[in-house]
């Protein structure tokens, strides 16, 4: 049976493809390439949030100008283009959980939630309703046949690798999705956009979380969860109270800059004690992480969970999109996934994604991932943390801070 360039049966003109058009250069080129090949292309753009101050902000995605840019590209290509209002859904599925997670001292990854819900669930359902044979996006990741299904692999352009944000994609979704840019370098994508005469050819890439102006997470939390912005104290892991802070939402594990205390020692945020509004700080070595426990794991590997190797599986894992992967061993016992690092890793916070790969090399397969619930460090560090967390004197300092604030 003849398969076209998207591994669909028949000639391109027999396949209808919905393209998720964000208004950026990548998704525009996807629409252009597929249209050029002869596919029946339909463009869809999602309005995700109240544009506000972000409407004309350089480096934001999903802003108001993006919708207009997507419309103009679709017009250039002569394809149908629809704008769907997903603002309410986006707030419920992405923004509110992000704020809730941050208020609880976690470091969430909202782009994963957006792909997991709005883009690859809701939009995919819309594509099916339109009779599309596949949904194509401008993500830099590869999709290939693997046995009876398809699997995800790191892209050719490793500098643009977006696999970290796509680990939660289900097998059913992977089988329906297509990623035409997986084998292309970004520079070539821009060249194609120029050749096709797109107004977005020189447009800046999106960099910030779309609903977080200037990357200030605390501003969003303060607006959506004002009750979570409580003052407290900054405590050294040795138990010494170093100063005060105006809210834990201003901190994340591993942070060094902007802590708000000066001691002559390089200090990092080691732990966030949300219940007692304490920011625990210490030297960098206190951040070294040995083990992680995960929740909401999406397993895409070939091994059946009911027959998972008792000694685990060796693989590469990433805990931040911008960091290299590290060798680790994944375990699954009694419904719980855990990761033992075989190479040093640090600054891992609850809420972060931990993504699995079958190796460190280019083109490695994505085996799934999950979200960090908690981590384990060296025994000595864990003992110091427990000691300071149970210290009644620093708790008293927090209580005194609350009373002082209330009396003003």
Swiss-Prot record:
Domain of life where this protein originates: Bacteria
GO MF annotation: an example: tRNA binding
Catalytic reaction(s) noted: S-sulfanyl-L-cysteinyl-[protein] + uridine(34) in tRNA + AH2 + ATP = 2-thiouridine(34) in tRNA + L-cysteinyl-[protein] + A + AMP + diphosphate + H(+)
Gene Ontology biological process terms, A to Z: tRNA wobble position uridine thiolation
Catalytic residues of the enzyme: 114 (nucleophile), 210 (cysteine persulfide intermediate)
Swiss-Prot/TrEMBL keywords: ATP-binding, Cytoplasm, Disulfide bond, Nucleotide-binding, RNA-binding, Transferase, tRNA processing, tRNA-binding
Main location as per UniProt: cytoplasm
Signal peptide boundaries: none
Keyword Disulfide bond: yes
Entry GO CC: cytoplasm
Binding site for ATP: 20-27, 46, 138
Chain intervals for the UniProt region annotation (Interaction with tRNA): 160-162
Subcellular localization(s) per the UniProt record: Cytoplasm
Marked site positions, Interaction with tRNA: 139, 352
Keyword tRNA processing carried by entry: yes
HAMAP family documented for this protein: tRNA_thiouridyl_MnmA
Role, per record: Catalyzes the 2-thiolation of uridine at the wobble position (U34) of tRNA, leading to the formation of s(2)U34.
Family: Belongs to the MnmA/TRMU family.
This protein's name: tRNA-specific 2-thiouridylase MnmA
Organism: Bartonella quintana (strain Toulouse)
């Amino acid at each position: 049976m003849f398969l076209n360039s998207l591994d669909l049966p028949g000639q391109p003109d027999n396949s209808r493809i919905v393209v998720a058009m964000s208004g950026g250069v990548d998704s525009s080129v996807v629409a252009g390439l597929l249209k050029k090949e002869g596919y029946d292309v339909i463009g869809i753009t999602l309005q995700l949030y109240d544009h506000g101050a972000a409407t004309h902000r350089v480096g934001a995605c999903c802003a108001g100008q993006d919708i207009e840019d997507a419309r103009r590209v679709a017009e250039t290509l002569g394809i149908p283009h629809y704008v769907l209002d997903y603002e309410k859904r986006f707030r419920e599925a992405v923004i509110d959980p992000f704020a809730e997670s941050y208020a609880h001292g976690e470091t969430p990854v909202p782009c994963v939630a957006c792909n997991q819900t709005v883009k690859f669930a809701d939009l995919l359902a819309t594509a099916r309703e339109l009779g599309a044979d596949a949904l194509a996006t401008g993500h830099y990741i590869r999709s290939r046949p693997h046995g009876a299904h398809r699997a995800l692999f790191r892209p050719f352009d490793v500098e643009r690798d977006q696999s970290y944000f796509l680990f939660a994609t289900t097998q059913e979704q992977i089988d329906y999705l297509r990623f035409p840019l997986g084998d292309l370098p970004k520079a070539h994508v821009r060249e194609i956009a120029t050749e096709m005469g797109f107004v977005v050819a020189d447009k800046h890439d999106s960099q910030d979380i779309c609903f977080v102006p200037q990357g200030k997470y605390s501003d969003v939390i303060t607006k959506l969860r004002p009750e979570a912005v409580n003052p407290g104290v900054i405590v050294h892991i040795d138990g010494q109270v170093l100063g005060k802070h105006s809210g834990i939402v201003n901190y994340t594990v591993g942070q060094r800059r902007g802590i708000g205390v000066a001691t002559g020692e390089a200090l990092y945020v080691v732990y966030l004690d949300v219940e007692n509004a304490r920011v625990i700080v210490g030297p960098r070595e206190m951040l070294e992480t040995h083990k992680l426990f995960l929740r909401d794991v999406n397993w895409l590997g070939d091994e059946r969970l009911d027959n998972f190797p008792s000694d685990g599986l060796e693989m590469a894992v990433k805990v931040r999109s911008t960091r290299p992967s590290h060798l680790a061993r994944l375990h699954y016992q009694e419904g719980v996934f855990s990761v033992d690092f075989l190479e040093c890793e640090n600054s891992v916070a609850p809420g972060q994604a931990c993504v699995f790969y079958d190796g460190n090399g280019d083109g490695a397969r994505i085996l799934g991932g999950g979200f960090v619930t908690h981590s384990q460090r060296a025994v000595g560090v864990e003992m110091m943390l427990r000691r300071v967390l149970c210290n009644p004197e620093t708790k008293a300092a927090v209580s005194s801070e609350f009373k002082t604030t209330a009396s003003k």
